[in-house]
Amino acid sequence: MKEKLKELQELAIKQIENSIKSNELEEIRVKFLGKKGELTTILRGMGGLSPEERPLVGKLVNEAKAKVEEKLESAIKKIKDKEKAEKLAGETIDISLPGKKQVIGKSHPLELTLKNMEDIFVSMGFTIEEGPEVEYDHYNFEALNIPKNHPARSEQDTLYINDNIVLRTQTSPVQVRTMENQKPPIKMISPGKVYRSDSVDATHSPIFYQMEGLVIDKGVTFADLKGTLELFAKKMFGDKVETKFRPHHFPFTEPSAEMDATCFVCGGEGCRVCKNSGWIELLGCGMVHPNVLRNCGIDPEVYSGFAFGFGVDRMVMLKYGIDDIRLLYESDMRFLNQF
């Protein structure tokens, strides 16, 4: 029995030493140490031995198993280390290879236009002011001379949080807050998002961008308003652009007007974009209503001022010839990569 155990032990160790793959070692383990393995079978057959032989044979079998297991574990570790090293060698990075080209982002046409407009007004001495998009009724309507029964207050046009709080429908509340917190002279613009209860179509969106401007000082006239906006139009669209002012009505300015510019597409000749009129509406403007000045603690007998407002999305569409406002908000890279 002792000789047989020695032969099995030597055979197992020899096969282990000759193995070069993990699956080969697993086969050896099953062959000698598994439930039906040769060394395990000897242990199970000890019932047929005499009481005197059992302790000796049991000791010899366990010693043989221990040596085979030790050799097996060592071989398994060695093969795994080798396989790992080979895998790592195959995955080595060639640092001489060129790297992947990074995709460079681009500015959105809305951002480009806003930045362009801001730069023009800042160069003219305007400051940029900001305010909350969730606004009190007082700042959005009351302080701007928009009475309780005004159509702009209806739920068809305005998104209400509650009776006293709305999503601002214009950036004019920033002008009110600025007049409350700063003493004249004031020369500011207020770009930002505004909200209306509109259905989405080619020319309407419930969220869009506005830029409004305000100038308050002693002796400010409508001529100052015209000169400021005409200069802006030339800087924005080129020296050849012409402008004209039409009478209009806004509750927060008096007198009020709308400014048109010669069509950027046809140069005033008439086309589909300008509906063959040669002119495109750019903005609303006017002299600040005395009631608005009083509401903000400014004496209209001493100070006067003018205000104006652009739809920035509209400016983008006019400047780049875009005929659907939805393109500005759909994040379609085929569209955005054109800018």
UniProtKB/Swiss-Prot annotation:
Alphabetically ordered keywords of this record: Aminoacyl-tRNA synthetase, ATP-binding, Cytoplasm, Ligase, Magnesium, Metal-binding, Nucleotide-binding, Protein biosynthesis
UniProt gene name: pheS
Listed GO MF terms: ATP binding; catalytic activity, acting on a protein; magnesium ion binding; phenylalanine-tRNA ligase activity; transferase activity; tRNA binding
Name of the molecule in the record: Phenylalanine--tRNA ligase alpha subunit
InterPro entries reported in the protein's UniProt record: aa-tRNA-synth_II, aa-tRNA-synth_II/BPL/LPL, Phe-tRNA-synth_IIc_asu, Phe-tRNA_ligase_II_N, Phe_tRNA_ligase_alpha1_bac, Phenylalanyl-tRNA_Synthase, tRNA-bd_arm
Cofactor: Mg(2+)
Keyword Aminoacyl-tRNA synthetase: yes
Enzyme Commission (EC) number: 6.1.1.20
CDD domains with a match to the protein in the record: PheRS_alpha_core
SUBUNIT field: Tetramer of two alpha and two beta subunits.
Subcellular location: Cytoplasm
Protein family according to the UniProt entry: Belongs to the class-II aminoacyl-tRNA synthetase family. Phe-tRNA synthetase alpha subunit type 1 subfamily.
A GO cellular-component term linked to this record: cytoplasm
Major localisation: cytoplasm
UniProt catalytic activity: tRNA(Phe) + L-phenylalanine + ATP = L-phenylalanyl-tRNA(Phe) + AMP + diphosphate + H(+)
Binding locations of Mg(2+): E254
